[in-house]
């Protein structure tokens, strides 16, 4: 029984550490990322069944497992940040009901689809 409690405590502390590191990385990315403003819209590229997942910070470890968008969905990108040899974008997606979702996504999953403002 003691072993089970110990294992459970270890799992909880790993989860807590991952959440803390994602929060810290999100702060670093926010401070040091390249800001787009609201100039560009991007569209998810990929074949049917592809999912581009949102992340709470620009890292694979910070993936939000049930939050994703699919090909042809459009987002507004606000910021760019390079981490883990990968380009990430901080974006907002607005669904057909007007609900918005924001987070970090892999830039390679998108193409520029338009310009939001003249500057």
What is each stretch, according to the model?
Residues 3-16:
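Sec-dependent N-terminal signal peptides
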Residues 1-2, 46, 98, 110:
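Generic cytosolic/nucleocytoplasmic N-terminal low-complexity/intrinsically disordered segments
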Residues 6-8, 44, 81, 95:
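Generic marker of residues within folded, mature protein domains
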Residues 19-58, 67-71, 80-81, 111-119:
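SH3-family beta-barrel domains
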């Amino acid at each position: 029984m003691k072993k089970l409690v110990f294992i459970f405590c270890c799992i909880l502390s790993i989860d807590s550490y991952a959440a803390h590191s994602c929060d810290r990385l999100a702060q670093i990315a926010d401070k040091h990322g390249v800001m787009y403003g609201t100039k560009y819209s991007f569209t998810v590229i990929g074949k049917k069944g592809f999912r581009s997942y949102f992340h709470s910070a620009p890292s694979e470890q910070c993936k939000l497992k049930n939050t994703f968008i699919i090909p042809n969905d459009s987002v507004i990108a606000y910021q760019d940040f390079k981490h883990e040899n990968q380009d990430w974008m901080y974006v907002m997606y607005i669904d057909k009901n007007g609900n918005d979702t924001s987070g970090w996504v892999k830039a390679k999953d998108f193409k520029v689809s338009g310009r939001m403002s003249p500057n």
